[in-house]
Amino acid sequence: MSGRGKGGKGLGKGGAKRHRKVLRDNIQGITKPAIRRLARRGGVKRISGLIYEETRSVLKVFLENVIRDAVTYTEHARRKTVTAMDVVYALKRQGRTLYGFGG
């Protein structure tokens, strides 16, 4: 084993950094046209104006759950890098099997 020792910081519970960028309103990066394109791919013709914020909130909850599980797999393997397989296993755990990314 490499010299990791006991304890150590897990992902997601790191100590304070000197210059930490404050992350807020990043969900607004999912733009209205991006949501519209996803809906078009799903076969939607017309979209209500209220859909965009609702879609952002649902997507945020979904990604938080997947990322939490993926980071749990990463920490269990004592790695600091989340791999594609961590995400595949996290999705599989939630009943959304994804093919084409190894494993």
From Swiss-Prot:
Residues 17-21 bind DNA. It holds the Pfam family CENP-T_C. Keywords: Acetylation, Chromosome, DNA-binding, Methylation, Nucleosome core, Nucleus. Its main location: nucleus. GO terms for cellular component: nucleosome; nucleus. The modification N6-methyllysine is found at K21. Residues 1-14 have a biased composition (Gly residues). The modification N-acetylserine is found at S2. Residues 1-20 are annotated as: Disordered. One of its GO terms (molecular function) is protein heterodimerization activity. The modification N6-acetyllysine is found at K17. Gene3D superfamilies: Histone, subunit A. The keyword Lipoprotein does not apply. It is found in: Nucleus; Chromosome. The keyword Transferase does not apply. Core component of nucleosome. Nucleosomes wrap and compact DNA into chromatin, limiting DNA accessibility to the cellular machineries which require DNA as a template. Histones thereby play a central role in transcription regulation, DNA repair, DNA replication and chromosomal stability. DNA accessibility is regulated via a complex set of post-translational modifications of histones, also called histone code, and nucleosome remodeling. The nucleosome is a histone octamer containing two molecules each of H2A, H2B, H3 and H4 assembled in one H3-H4 heterotetramer and two H2A-H2B heterodimers. The octamer wraps approximately 147 bp of DNA. Belongs to the histone H4 family. This is Histone H4. It comes from Pyrenomonas salina.
